[in-house]
């Protein structure tokens, strides 16, 4: 008798996606982050659902409802901190996942890559709106500063900002709609993830060598399910240590003060995972230019496949490109650091140099280095 997982209409889909899926035999731990992102999304949806049961999206009670969750709800504090720090783990895995894609040339799977970029934007939008919900000082001022950037759009800018705010400032209407969007977007993300996987399974996974895996495939289960479980254990261990020992390590102390429109915090800054983009935004004196640079800092990922000049898919055997890649990584760390610093000398100059280097590396230096490597390899 045929196994039910191979005949049942629904289980057949699951089987071909996660059990009998032919996978390259040589993919490394860098390929773990896809499943870890799925786990992060599940954690965020479950904890978020429980938080939504006790949260009130109203300017008068939002801050106290979060306090109520932490103090009065059974295990409320751990649900709240799992959700807050789960977002950090989510972005950590996202950045590593994208970095792996750039290093090993996974961007040549165009459809998967482009859906991935849409996913990145959607997750960033969700995280931004979620940060506004506790209605602390940094929530309020972060929302004010970032939404206000849209006023840089010529002609329709001011109207657009007031339309998003639902009034003439960030207020009750803004909080209510941000809560509604923050609730619905993770489900849209889940649907996009399925499309992402659909396109991935059309072509099959890339591998560290960048060569075709057609002649050497192994079943996903048990080989990669056990490998993914190990990665999941490390993820949960890190998240648990963070939540139980220093839950506020990655947060901002200003957010423990209720939102006050009459008092501006000394340094308005987003969560750590947006700091690199925030640094790029601040490094350009012109408002519209800054907004365009901010969008391009992520959207530049969509141009990477067009700029691919190398004859080899991965950077595994291209030492010069590897050096450029790690300089780019160091540059992103620098931008993240600068984004958290006040707007004063020498941080402004460092930020501007790092921003120019970021775009130069991706648009000019790395494609040129790839061409040089082609010449060296007589290709």
UniProtKB/Swiss-Prot annotation:
Amino-acid positions noted as binding heme b b566 in the UniProt annotation, renumbered to this chain: 97, 196
Binding-site list for a ubiquinone: 201
Assigned GO CC terms: mitochondrial inner membrane; respiratory chain complex III
Cofactors demanded by this protein: heme b
Recorded GO MF terms: metal ion binding; ubiquinol-cytochrome-c reductase activity
Residues passing through the membrane, by range: 33-53, 77-98, 113-133, 178-198, 226-246, 288-308, 320-340, 347-367
Main location: mitochondrion
PROSITE patterns found in the cross-reference section: CYTB_CTER, CYTB_NTER
Location of this chain's protein in the cell: Mitochondrion inner membrane
Pfam family, one: Cytochrom_B_C
SUPFAM superfamilies: a domain/subunit of cytochrome bc1 complex (Ubiquinol-cytochrome c reductase), Transmembrane di-heme cytochromes
Family label: Belongs to the cytochrome b family.
Further comment: Heme 1 (or BL or b562) is low-potential and absorbs at about 562 nm, and heme 2 (or BH or b566) is high-potential and absorbs at about 566 nm.
Assembly description: The cytochrome bc1 complex contains 11 subunits: 3 respiratory subunits (MT-CYB, CYC1 and UQCRFS1), 2 core proteins (UQCRC1 and UQCRC2) and 6 low-molecular weight proteins (UQCRH/QCR6, UQCRB/QCR7, UQCRQ/QCR8, UQCR10/QCR9, UQCR11/QCR10 and a cleavage product of UQCRFS1). This cytochrome bc1 complex then forms a dimer.
Protein name in the entry: Cytochrome b
Protein source organism: Microcebus sambiranensis (Sambirano mouse lemur)
């Amino acid at each position: 008798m045929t196994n039910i997982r191979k005949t049942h209409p629904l289980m057949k889909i699951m089987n071909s996606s996660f059990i009998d899926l032919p996978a390259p035999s040589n993919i490394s731990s860098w390929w773990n982050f896809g499943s870890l992102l799925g786990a992060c999304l599940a954690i965020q949806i479950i904890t978020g659902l429980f938080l939504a049961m006790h949260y009130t999206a109203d300017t008068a009670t939002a801050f106290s409802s979060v306090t109520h969750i932490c103090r009065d709800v059974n295990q409320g504090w751990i649900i709240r901190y799992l959700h807050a720090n789960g977002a950090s783990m989510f972005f950590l895995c996202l950045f590593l996942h994208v970095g792996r894609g750039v290093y090993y040339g996974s961007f040549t799977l165009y459809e998967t890559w482009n859906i991935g970029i849409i996913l990145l934007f959607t997750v960033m939008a969700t995280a931004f709106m979620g940060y506004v919900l506790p209605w602390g000082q940094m929530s309020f001022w972060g929302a004010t500063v970032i939404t206000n950037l849209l006023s840089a759009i010529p002609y329709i800018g001011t109207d657009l900002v007031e339309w998003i705010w639902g009034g003439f400032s960030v207020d009750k209407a803004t909080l209510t709609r941000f809560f509604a969007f923050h609730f619905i977007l993770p489900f849209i993300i889940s649907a996009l993830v399925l499309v992402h996987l659909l396109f991935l399974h059309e072509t099959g996974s890339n591998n560290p060598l960048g060569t075709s895996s057609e002649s050497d495939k192994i079943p996903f289960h048990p080989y990669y399910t056990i490998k993914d479980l190990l990665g999941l254990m490390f993820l949960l261990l890190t998240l648990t240590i963070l939540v139980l020992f220093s839950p506020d390590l990655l947060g901002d102390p200003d957010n423990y003060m209720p939102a006050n429109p009459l008092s501006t915090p000394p340094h308005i800054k987003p969560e750590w995972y947006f700091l690199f983009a925030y640094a790029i935004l601040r490094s350009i004196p012109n408002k519209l230019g800054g907004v365009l640079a901010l969008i391009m800092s992520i959207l530049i990922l969509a141009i990477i496949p067009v700029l691919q000049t190398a004859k080899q898919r991965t950077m595994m055997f291209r030492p010069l490109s590897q050096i450029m890649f790690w300089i780019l990584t160091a540059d992103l760390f620098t931008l993240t650091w600068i984004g958290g610093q006040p707007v004063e000398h020498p941080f402004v100059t460092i930020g501007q140099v790092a921003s120019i280097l970021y775009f130069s590396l991706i648009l000019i230096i790395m494609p040129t280095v790839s061409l040089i490597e082609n010449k060296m390899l007589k290709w």
